[in-house]
UniProtKB/Swiss-Prot annotation:
PANTHER family: BETA-DEFENSIN 113
Protein name in UniProt: Beta-defensin 18
Gene: Defb18
Signal sequence range: 1-23
Transmembrane segments: none
GO cellular component, one term: extracellular region
Keywords for this protein: Antibiotic, Antimicrobial, Defensin, Disulfide bond, Secreted, Signal
Disulfide bonds: C39-C65, C46-C60, C50-C66
Subcellular localization: Secreted
Pfam families: Defensin_beta_2
Length: 85
């Protein structure tokens, strides 16, 4: 009777320890989904390689998240005072 209770206890411990928390593939899938979501938040796309006008933000799964570089005007040249004589 005691040996069957010990075996039952061991089996329950194994079942509970294995079933706790997400498995490794589920965590990997969740990380990939979060990275892809972050990529879409910065208006990027997950592609095999980035073009010259894009930069790598982070990696979605194995491919980079490519974000388009924005054109920024040079405010310094536009805001310089004009001198008149």
């Amino acid at each position: 009777m005691q040996s069957t209770m010990k075996m039952f206890g061991i089996i329950l411990m194994v079942i509970f320890s294995v079933s706790c928390g997400p498995s490794a593939p589920q965590m990997k899938t969740r990380e990939v989904a979060e990275r892809t979501h972050k990529c879409s938040l910065v208006r990027g796309t997950c592609k095999s390689e980035c073009n010259s006008w894009e930069y790598k933000y982070n990696y979605c799964h194995t491919e980079p998240c490519c974000v388009v570089r924005e054109y920024k005007r040079m405010e310094k040249l536009l805001s310089t005072p004009k001198y008149t004589t």
